[in-house]
A protein has these predicted regions:
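Peripheral, non-catalytic segments that deliver or gate enzyme domains
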Residues: 27-61, 67-89, 93-110, 115-121, ...
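Charged, compositionally biased N-terminal leader segments and the immediate start
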Residues: 1-29
């Protein structure tokens, strides 16, 4: 939040506070509240001073050598380029010593499998930053799902001007190899904290603090809007709001054919949130404790409780993974399939879906295991048939 001179201590370090009303408890004085203005010159000078103190204490004769060794690993061309598939292309974002801000690029499957891919560079972020005089940090791409048979062409690219939480979202045409001009209706959202998601080819769902839209006391987006081409954020239809003292709002659309759903999330705090799905123009909150993490995929709703969760007399321990039919659960059904239960030796690190299978990344006695679960077949140790993927190193 922005502060004024009256909000932070004077040069002597003393802060003033209004006298409390009779009988009222005095308001606590936060002597560091002035640092909330993170772009203020006085605040940045203070940060530089603290950095200098730290460097003086930590930088010894071995520091430069250690830094060079770390950078050699981070900049190594032997790293595996991680990719994401969109249509027939495999996309990668690559940073190294020559490209510190990164290259957004793509290649074909045969080229990628050959071991020395021929990369088609779509965007050089270093060149963009130099051309626009802004220290852009690339925060990812969100593709519009095209009509069947059409290529993935349009994407929202997120750029932070300083590496922080606030992003500017700009529409990019990968076939034209450039940003879609706002004068021609291209989306170009001003920098703000929040998120943006495609609803359709001409509409975005946006939660943001830009253009003075409401924000929470945590300085994140409080409102979700439906933004159509040609509209400003202030003209957009408001579709979701949360209390000011909650952390942040998110709105997003799942465009999976046959399973299209629009979601809104009220992040109450860092560890608690309520998730709602849009039904017939109304938000329907999914009935789970606020500390149960939710995710959906096609027919399924997955649950990851952060604390023990008792449902229909059965207690599921924290760290479990459970599943239910999406529509059945919304209709009141509470028949949960147990997909994973932690034990003293095993924890669930992450999971991901293919079209038909669920992959669990387990850590057993500090060794990774990948389990492939099939929702179509009953299992023995879990509700769904599971096999261990033994082809992983």
């Amino acid at each position: 939040m922005t502060t004024t001179e009256a909000d932070h201590p004077s040069a002597s370090g003393q802060a003033s506070a209004a006298s409390p009303a009779a009988g009222a408890s005095p308001e606590p004085v936060d002597e560091n509240i002035w640092l909330e203005d993170i772009y203020g010159q006085e605040q940045l000078a203070w940060v530089r001073e603290q950095n200098a103190r730290t460097e003086e204490l930590l930088e010894d004769a071995d520091y430069a050598e250690l830094e060079d060794r770390i950078l050699e690993v981070l900049d190594s061309t032997d790293r595996i380029p991680m990719v994401g598939k969109h249509g027939e292309w495999y996309y990668n974002f690559w940073k190294d010593r020559a490209n510190p801000r990164g290259l957004w690029r793509r290649t074909g499957w045969d080229s990628y499998r050959a071991g020395a891919p021929e990369w088609d560079v779509l965007l050089d972020v270093d060149a963009l930053a130099a051309a626009e005089g802004q220290d852009w940090v690339f925060h990812g791409a969100n593709f519009l799902r095209p009509a069947p048979g059409e290529p993935h062409r349009l994407a929202l690219l997120a750029f932070s001007p300083d590496g922080g939480d606030a992003n500017r979202y700009r529409e990019f045409d990968v076939e034209a190899r450039g940003f879609v001009d706002p004068a021609d209706g291209g989306f170009d959202l001003p920098t703000g904290k929040g998120n943006a998601s495609w609803l359709d080819g001409d509409t975005l769902l946006v939660a943001t603090t830009a253009e003075d839209l409401p924000r929470t006391t945590s300085s994140y987006a409080r409102t979700g809007v439906k933004l159509r081409r040609g509209e400003s954020l202030t003209q957009a239809e408001r579709i979701f709001d949360i209390p000011e003292d909650h952390m942040m709002a998110i709105v997003a659309h799942d465009s999976t054919p046959g399973f299209e759903r629009t979601f809104a999330v009220d992040w109450i705090s860092f560890f608690e949130k309520n998730t709602s799905v849009l039904r017939d123009g109304e938000w329907v909150q999914i009935d789970v404790p606020a500390d149960v993490n939710l995710s959906s995929h096609r027919d399924w709703l997955l649950f990851r409780p952060q604390r023990d969760w008792t449902v229909n007399g059965t207690t599921h321990p924290a760290g479990s993974l459970l599943a239910a039919g999406f529509e059945d659960y919304l209709a009141g059904g509470r028949d949960l399939a147990v997909l994973f239960t932690p034990d003293p030796h095993t924890s669930l690190q992450s999971w991901s879906w293919t079209r038909d299978f669920l992959l669990l990344n387990l850590l057993r006695d500090v060794s990774s295991e990948i389990h492939v679960l099939d929702p179509r077949r009953p299992g023995t140790d879990s509700a769904w048939a599971a096999t261990v993927l033994d082809a992983c190193p």
